[in-house]
Design a protein with these regions (language model features):
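Bacterial Sec-dependent N-terminal signal peptides
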Residues: 1-39
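Sec-dependent signal peptide cleavage junction
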Residues: 33-68
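Short, conserved catalytic-motif segment at the N-terminal edge
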Residues: 58, 62-122, 144-146, 157-160, ...
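Short active-site loop at a secondary-structure junction
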Residues: 80-92, 111-175, 212-224, 293-296
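Short, surface-exposed loop or secondary-structure junction motifs
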Residues: 109, 163-383
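Short, gly/Ser/Thr-rich active-site loops of penicillin-recognizing serine hydrolases
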Residues: 347, 375, 403-475, 539
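Surface-exposed, charged secondary-structure patches
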Residues: 357, 478-522, 529-531
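Short, well-ordered beta-strand elements
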Residues: 379-380, 390-393, 397-406, 516-518, ...
C-alpha cells in the first residue's frame, strides 16, 4: 500500500468514527450534566448575613428577676467584706449595656470616715491590663502594628537583649499580651514599680533581663511585659500611652471619672489603701503614675468601669449591627479567647461547697474560665499594696460583677464567683438561645419526610457526596426502620435545637419511645447533610 492510499483510508475511517462517537459523546456530556444538576441543592445560595439571626434571651422577665435578687447580692458582698475585715469596699452589677446596681461598704478614707460607694475611685491594679491590650488591638486594627511582630521593632533596645537560649524566638507583641514572653513571675517586685520612668525601663532592658523560660512556650505572669506594651503604644503613636487610652478608649466609652494619677482625684472620691498590721490599720503610700501604669495604674469607680464591662458584653453575640465602640466587636471577642492555657482545677468548689471542675486560660490581658456546666467567665483580678479588686462578665448570660476593696491584696474572686452563681440560680437565668437558621430548618423538614424508608433519598439533593459512601442507603434504611418500629406510632416531632448555624438535633416521639436525630451540614452553600445519627432515647 502506497502512502497516498494509506492516507485516504485513514481519513475515511476517521470521519466515519467521528460520525459514530460524536453523538455518543454529546449524550454522555448531557447525562453527566443532568446527573450533576439533579444533585445540586434546590436552595439558592445566599450570603450568611442575610439570614443570620443572633442568639437572644427568651425570658421577658429576665431583668426584673435580676433586680429582685439585688438584696441577696448586696448581702453577699457586705457579709464578705465584714468577714474579711475590709476597711471599705465598692461593688456593682452590670446587665447588658448598663450598671443596674452599685453599692458600698465601710470607708475609703478611715481618717475622715468617707463612705465607700459606686462612685469611689479605687486603684484597680491589674484590672488595667485588658485596657492596655485593647489599645494594642486598636492599633493593630488600624494597621499600625502586628501582634506577631517582634517586639524589638517597636522597642529597638530589645533587639540586643539576650534570651534564655540561642534557639529562642524573638519576643512578639502577642507573647507580651498573653504572659508568654519568658519573663519570670514578678508580682511583688512589679507592684512597687508603678511610678517608674521610661528611661528606667529602657536601662533595665539594656542591662539584660533574667528570663525564666524561652518565649512562646509557657504562661508566666509578667507585669514587666505589660510595661513594655505601654511603651510600644507610646512609641507607635508618639504620645504617652495614658493619653492615647484616655482619648481612644475612656472618652468614647464615657469613662469621664477614670484617671491615672491619684493626685488628680477629688479627695472625697479617692480610696486610700490600707494593710492590717500589728492590730491596727496602716495606710499604704500611693504611688504616682508612671511607665508601669500600663500593667496596673488605673484609678476608677464601679460605675465608670462598669461602662467598660458593658462594652465587653456588647461584643456578644456576633451580629450585623453597626460598630459603636472604640474597637471592633470582633477584636473584643478576640481578647477574650483562651490564648494560653493557665490551669485546670478538677476539684474547684463554689463558695456554697458545690464541686465543679474549672479550667482557666489567659487571653489578651484577660483571664477566661470555663466550669463543668460550660459556663464561661471572663475578667481579671487586681492586687497592689493597699488594694484588691476583681471583675467578671459572663457574655452568654449578659451579666457582670465588679468588686473593689482598699485592703492589701484583698481577694475578690471568691465573692464574685458566689454572686454570679447565686444570681443565676435565684433569677433562673439561662444563656441566650440560638434561633434555627433557615437552612437547618429546611434540612430537618426534608429528613422528616425521608425517614425511615429513605425513598428516593439518593436523588433528593439533601445529602453531601460523602453521605452514602460512608454508610450505604440499605444499611441506613434497615437501622432506621428498626428504630421506628421500636417506638411505635409517631405522636410528635419536637422543635429543632440548634447547636450552631449548621448542626442541631430534634426528637421523634412515638407511643413506646423516642428517637434523637442529630445532624450536621457541610460548608457548601447551601449546606448539605454530611452526618446523621439516629439514637434511641433511653429514659
Amino acid at each position: 500500500m502506497d502512502w497516498i492510499t494509506f492516507t485516504k483510508k485513514f481519513l475515511l475511517n476517521y470521519y466515519q468514527m467521528k460520525k459514530l462517537f460524536l453523538p455518543l459523546g454529546i449524550l454522555l456530556v448531557n447525562y453527566a450534566y443532568c446527573q450533576q444538576n439533579a444533585r445540586q441543592p434546590q436552595t439558592t445560595p445566599v450570603s450568611s448575613y442575610e439570614t443570620y439571626q443572633p442568639p437572644i434571651f427568651t425570658d421577658p422577665q429576665r431583668l426584673a428577676k435580676i433586680k429582685a435578687a439585688i438584696p441577696v447580692v448586696e448581702k453577699l458582698y457586705r457579709d464578705y467584706a465584714e468577714k474579711n475585715h475590709f476597711p471599705g469596699m465598692a461593688f456593682g452589677l452590670v446587665v447588658d449595656n448598663q450598671v443596674i446596681y452599685s453599692g458600698g461598704y465601710g470607708y475609703t478614707d478611715l481618717a475622715n470616715k468617707t463612705k465607700a460607694s459606686g462612685k469611689s475611685l479605687f486603684r484597680i491594679a491589674s484590672m488595667s491590663k485588658s485596657v492596655t491590650t485593647m489599645a494594642i488591638l486598636k492599633l493593630r486594627d488600624e494597621g499600625k502594628l502586628r501582634l506577631d511582630d517582634p517586639a524589638y521593632l517597636y522597642i529597638p533596645e530589645l533587639k540586643a537583649m539576650p534570651l534564655l537560649t540561642k534557639d529562642a524566638p524573638a519576643i512578639t507583641i502577642r507573647n507580651l499580651m498573653t504572659h508568654a514572653a519568658g519573663f519570670p513571675e514578678d508580682n511583688p517586685w512589679g507592684d512597687r514599680q508603678l511610678d517608674g520612668k521610661d528611661e528606667e525601663l529602657i536601662n533595665l532592658i539594656k542591662s539584660g533581663i533574667s528570663n525564666s523560660n524561652v518565649p512562646g512556650v509557657q504562661y508566666e505572669y509578667s507585669n514587666l511585659g505589660f510595661a513594655m506594651l505601654g511603651k510600644i503604644i507610646g512609641n507607635v503613636t508618639g504620645i504617652p500611652y495614658q493619653q492615647y487610652i484616655n482619648e481612644n478608649i475612656f472618652k468614647p466609652l464615657g469613662m469621664d471619672h477614670t484617671l491615672w494619677e491619684y493626685s488628680k482625684v477629688p479627695a472625697d472620691l479617692l480610696a486610700h489603701g490600707y494593710r492590717w498590721e500589728e492590730g491596727q490599720w496602716k495606710e499604704e503610700a500611693l504611688l504616682h503614675d508612671g511607665t508601669y501604669g500600663a500593667m496596673g495604674g488605673i484609678l476608677t469607680s464601679v460605675e465608670d468601669f462598669g461602662k467598660y464591662m458593658a462594652f465587653h458584653l456588647s461584643a456578644w453575640p456576633a451580629k450585623n449591627d453597626p460598630e459603636a465602640g472604640p474597637i471592633k466587636r470582633s477584636s473584643v471577642r478576640e481578647m477574650q479567647l483562651p490564648w494560653v492555657f493557665n490551669n485546670l482545677n478538677a476539684k474547684f468548689k463554689y463558695p456554697n461547697g458545690r464541686e465543679c471542675a474549672l479550667v482557666s486560660s489567659y487571653g489578651y490581658g484577660l483571664r477566661t474560665s470555663r466550669d463543668c456546666q460550660e459556663r464561661v467567665f471572663t475578667g481579671h483580678t487586681g492586687g497592689l499594696p493597699g488594694f484588691g479588686s476583681q471583675w467578671w462578665v459572663m457574655p452568654e448570660y449578659g451579666i457582670g460583677v465588679i468588686a473593689n476593696g482598699n485592703l492589701t491584696y484583698a481577694g475578690m474572686n471568691t465573692v464574685n464567683f458566689a454572686v454570679m452563681d447565686t444570681l443565676i440560680s435565684l433569677a433562673g437565668l439561662k444563656p441566650r438561645e440560638l434561633p434555627v437558621s433557615p437552612i437547618l430548618k429546611l434540612r430537618k423538614d426534608e429528613l422528616v419526610k425521608l425517614l425511615p424508608d429513605w425513598n428516593n433519598a439518593a436523588k433528593s439533593a439533601v445529602f453531601a457526596v460523602n453521605f452514602f459512601p460512608d454508610r450505604s442507603i440499605e444499611l441506613r434504611k434497615k437501622a432506621s426502620q428498626a428504630l421506628f418500629a421500636k417506638i411505635g406510632k409517631i405522636r410528635n416531632i419536637t422543635e429543632l435545637k440548634p447547636l450552631n448555624q449548621l448542626r442541631g438535633n430534634f426528637q421523634i416521639e412515638g407511643e413506646n419511645g423516642s428517637i434523637d436525630v442529630y445532624f450536621t451540614l457541610t460548608p457548601e452553600n447551601p449546606g448539605l447533610v454530611q452526618q446523621l445519627d439516629l439514637k434511641e432515647v433511653i429514659k
